[in-house]
From Swiss-Prot:
Name of the molecule in the record: Flagellar L-ring protein
Protein's UniProt keywords contain Amino-acid biosynthesis: no
Subunit structure: The basal body constitutes a major portion of the flagellar organelle and consists of four rings (L,P,S, and M) mounted on a central rod.
Transmembrane segments: none
Pfam families attached to this UniProt entry: FlgH (PF02107)
Amino acid sequence: MNKAILAVAMVLLLAGCATKPEEIGRAPDLSPVAAHLGMQNNPQFNGYPARPGKASYSLWDQRSTNFFKDPRAATPGDVLTVIISINDRANLDNKTDRERVSKGIYGGGGSFATSSITGAAAGGDMDASINTHSDSKSKGKGTIERSEDIRLQIAAIVTDTLPNGNLIIRGSQEVRVNNELRVLNVAGVVRPRDISGNNTISYDKIAEARISYGGRGRLSEIQQPPYGQQILDQFSPF
């Protein structure tokens, strides 16, 4: 019995730790290159043609840039630059005031008379009434103020082509500074005609855009409560 209690206590103690045991005393590891692209299981990448070799006795090297080819990304494996410039501000103020009062009186009356065995008459009146009253009030007020200013550039790679010609792109960037890892991810669907001549595209032209900017490390861990406290906050009724 004591061993079971000790085991449960150790599990709760480890659950309350904010830092993973394997990351104690060391900086977060960087993800492998192309780990977010799934290149191993993507047939588009596996079937991507290799660059041709240099032809013998030829003045033109096929490995050089083609002067007549569009430099914009168009096929899986091509790279383009995503420009993220978000300056979003929102102010929302909601207020509700509801009041409901209802009253009701329900009543009835009647008279009756009886004769006793001795012949004396007995009579009486009956009056029954029910009073109801209900009062309900509710007030609510909510205010939201949000301000976001993000200006970044990230290179993304074309991972797939849709049947209508649109491109699926995905990009990831990781920068580690002083044991803090900053991670930027972007993904979405773009139209080839929205890609500019310098092979860049703005974030607002990406459909189904998924943009995340965060980090891992000591600073990020301090800003959030430990796992154990999060579990208690989730299930505690108080």
